[in-house]
């Protein structure tokens, strides 16, 4: 009776101590999402695939150049459509299109802290420039009036395509 119990215990010990060949995932799903979020942080701030205007690095000079990334049909473009495009392009800085008066589009940024405090000056400038250039693609729009709480990196006001020296990017 002792011999079968001894063999059974020995068998269980051997099985319990042997390595399994089943591959363990390197990261659990939560860790994967965190790593992806950290490695793709710029994707969450700026989504180039949705952008009409953006900055491209000139391979010869190494400078960033403001470039129209995709053509638009100005005849059918509306402020509401542009609001959706901007909000998809900049998911962490959500705008509200308020309306148009004469040649000015009016937008607000209810939660402007990311824009004014967290994106840095270059990120905030990139947002402001690309948003102005995108809105001024709409027929008749020459200016964009921004309403938001001022911060370290961006200020509200009325801007147009001449508000920045885009040759310095």
Model-derived features: positions:
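Sec-dependent bacterial lipoprotein signal peptides
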Residues: 1-15
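Bimodal "functional hotspot" detector
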Residues: 17-169
